[in-house]
Amino acid sequence: MRAFVVRARAAPVDSQQFLAAIGHEAHTEILAHTLMNTIFVAQSHRDDVVVYLVLESTQDFSRTICFRSNELGHIGGFHEQNLTNKIAKALTVSKGMAKEQLREVEAGITVRTVSFEKLIQELAEDYQLYMLEKKGTPVRDIEFAANPCFLLTDHIPMPKKSFNSLKRLGTQHINLGPKMLFASQCVVLIHNELDMRL
C-alpha cells in the first residue's frame, strides 16, 4: 500500500472559502492536481493507494480528508472542478465536528478533525515515512519499504519545528532531482520510480 500526505497549510477548511481560493494566494487547486496524479492513470485508477489531504487554515481543527483508491465509487469525471468539489463536499460534511472525530463523506472518502502531527504519528506505526528534501538521498538510491508513505506540502514549505518530530518517527529524506517541483509532479515521479521496481 502506498500512502501520500499533502500538508496544505494555506488551504481553508470552509468549503466556500476553499472553492473561492482556487487560483488565488492559497492555491487550493494544488490539492486537486495532486489527487488526480496520485490516484488516477489512463482509463482507470491505481489500486492500493491512500491519499491524505491535510487542510490547516482554520479557527478550530485541521481537516484531514482521506481518499482510498480501492474503495472509491464513481468519481463523476476526471477533471479539476470535479475533484475540488469532492474536497469541498468533505469540508461541508466536516462542519461542526469536534476534535479527532471521523465522518464518512461517500464511498472511499472520509474526513477527520485531526492534525498533521497526530496523523503522521498514526501512519508511522504502519508505514515507513519519506519526506522530500533537496539534501535527501537520491530517489534511485533508496530501497523503499513495502509500505511507503510520502510527505508533501503545498506551496508553503514544511515548518522547521516539524522536522524534529518527523526525525523521531524515523522519516527518511529523499530527493527527486535538482529542480523544485509541484507536489502533483512529485507524486508522478514517485509512482514511476516504484512502478519500475515491480
Curated annotation (Swiss-Prot):
GO cellular component, one term: cytoplasm
Domain of life: Bacteria
Sequence similarity: Belongs to the methyltransferase superfamily. TrmY family.
Localization (cell): Cytoplasm
Record EC number: 2.1.1.-
InterPro entries according to UniProt: Alpha/beta_knot_MTases, TrmY, tRNA_m1G_MTases_N
Record's keyword terms, sorted: Cytoplasm, Methyltransferase, S-adenosyl-L-methionine, Transferase
GO biological process, one term: tRNA methylation
EC class name: transferase
GO molecular function: S-adenosylmethionine-dependent methyltransferase activity; tRNA methyltransferase activity
Protein name: Putative pseudouridine methyltransferase
